Regions:
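Short linear loop/turn motifs
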Residues: 30-33, 72-73
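Short helix-start
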Residues: 35-44, 51
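N-terminal first-folded block
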Residues: 1-27, 35
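Amphipathic, hydrophobic secondary-structure cores in small proteins
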Residues: 21, 27, 31, 43-47, ...
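Generic anion/oxyanion-binding catalytic loop in active/binding sites
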Residues: 1, 46-49
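C-terminal structural segments of small proteins and small subunits
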Residues: 48-73
Length: 73
């Protein structure tokens, strides 16, 4: 399994937007991304840091349901 890459918060937001998420708000150092469909709404907070830690990135991937391959190097 390839390793997860190092991404900034803005890079993560761009990847999530490609997966159908929209930024609904940003306050302080966190942006909130949201994806709605007929069944449920998925909300994911993204820290807008220069480099997001690997554990935090793993949590964002798990919460969003985005494919891990989009974040691998």
């Amino acid at each position: 399994m390839p390793k997860l890459g190092h991404f900034s918060g803005s890079e993560i937001c761009k990847i999530l937007e490609q997966q159908g998420f929209q930024m609904v708000r940003q306050r302080g150092s966190h942006a909130v991304m949201q994806k709605r469909d007929d069944i449920a709404t998925v909300t994911v907070p993204v820290p807008m840091h220069r480099e997001v830690r690997i554990g935090t990135l793993s949590s964002i991937i798990r919460q969003s349901g985005a494919p891990r391959s989009a974040f691998e190097t």
